[in-house]
Amino acid sequence: YIRQSLTHNSENNQLRNQLYDITKTPDEIEEIDIKDKYKVIKERRNSKLKSDYGVVTLIDQYVVNILPEGGRKSKVVLVYEIIDENGIEQMKEYQLNTYSLTLQKSEIVKADGSIVPAEEGSGTLVFSNLAIGDVIYIEYESYSNSTGRFYKDFNLDCYFNSTYPTVEAVFAIINPENVNYSTKLFNG
């Protein structure tokens, strides 16, 4: 009955979590997510990439799980390295509308491995005392659920043209077997 209820009320995340707990359904995003991001940061920092903006993207990951009952869950991981003074200016304030998101990480990983949390306020993450060699780590999840005639339809776009040079960009879709896609590629 819970699954049937979700079919008619897909925005009820509490009910979905209850169903997944009862049926022991794993979080599919967590199954493919990078497990130890701090290890990856340590391995990738000091990349040889150059940037006029003073920032290199070490990880740009966007994973979306199309839920069988309708709607979707998304997870974003962004990891930036500051490589010169321009990067400090670029990244000291990061605009992110956290209203509809669950912010999981927003921190600076210093060169010595210490972690400094960002300050949050009105759609802005503030990274104080940035220095060259610091890495900014941002991670958040969001749900996009609705009801009505088009509740199973969605438009999703992802870009691979970041302002900053990127070491790794990941765009992944997890979907039920019966999902059909209509795709368009522009300027590709």
Each language-model region and where it sits:
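Beta-strand-rich, non-transmembrane domain signature
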Residues: R3-G188
